[in-house]
Amino acid sequence: MSKATERDLIVGLDIGTSVIKAIVGELLDDDSISIIGVGTHKSRGMDKGGVNDLNLVVQSVRQAVNEMELMADCSVSSVFMSISGRHVQCQNESGMVPINNQEVTQDDVDNVIHAARSVPMAAERKLLHVLPQEFVIDVQEGIKNPIGMSGVRMEAAAHIITCAEDMAKNLVKCVESCGLSVDQTIFSALASSYAVLTDDERELGVCVVDIGGGTMDMVIYTDGAIRHTSVIPLAGNQITSDIAKIFRTPMSNAEDIKIKYACALKDMVSMEETIEVSSVGGRPARVMSRHTLAEVIEPRYQELFELAYEQIKASGLEEQIAAGLVITGGTAKMEGAVEFAEEIFQMPVRVGKPHSVKGLAEYVDDACFATAVGLLQYGKQNINNKRTSSKKGEESVLKRIQSWFKGEF
């Protein structure tokens, strides 16, 4: 069994409320990712993105990681981990600094981003992301990459995402209890956007709605940058609960019924179609109309989509989402979900599946793997950025040494 250090491997760990997914990918010479191992396990001990039984979460994570390692024939030591929950918050901030040498360098960019992130933050909050939106040099606005440009002062606008420190610590503790370290904690919807969006969609304006089991995570892009993020603590598990209660069937059976037979729009289902529903307490199974099932599910999807639509309107970005909506996550796959969403949002809607991966791509060609694959894409960018910074640092040291020699001799 090879170790991650012997190969250029990245691991994504999506600790969801319903399912835990672990994916390992190998960084190839052409800067693409080849997926070499996938592991999934039913999530236990999680509720709406938070840990409510640490030991159960540890067991579930260990099972998913072991399955992934077995498939990939490798041993991993660290992961890029997702996080969600209503405790995740966002804000847009700005910072300003003078340009040191009249020409913008990477140090100037780092300084202005640091100025933007230097906002008062409660002790119980953890900074997850500082995502630059655009730069202003003197009077020139809308600059995407300011390096090399001339000016006196520079301003940066940035989107800041934070979470509850304790929530993040509990998830990290679960991962570390499995003998792994966490490279970085990433907001779930941000990771999903890396997996399912195109550059054109980001530029035109797009909203990603990641509908999982416990939470519905959202991120809005306009002009190539993130402008708004939010989490709604309601998602697919509520639909399963509705089915279980109304049809008086166990939760496990309700989940199976949802996956196999459910439809988000009752008008798309024939009145003649029937399904068999197991009963509780040893009672005989019953035959129910699939149309009746859709009548139960449709109001819940309407609630979910209307809550998401309220978030879009509250952001003030509704008119800027020209590319429409991308729904992803396990709950986005249901028949009728796209059609129903188009009715409510009055904009184009598609289901987002991971793209731009090689290797075992067929294993993850599914909306429920959006976050896990996105963690690999995010991790790749993170690694490339570190390598670029390290290379620039080495070049800077070399230049200083050369200057010293010139001065001495």
Predicted features along the sequence, with ranges:
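Hydrophobic, well-ordered secondary-structure elements that form the walls
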Residues: 308, 327, 375
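Nucleotide/phosphate-binding catalytic cleft detector across ATP-hydrolyzing
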Residues: 1-19, 23-208, 225-227, 236, ...
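A structural feature that tracks compact, well-ordered secondary-structure segments
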Residues: 218-219
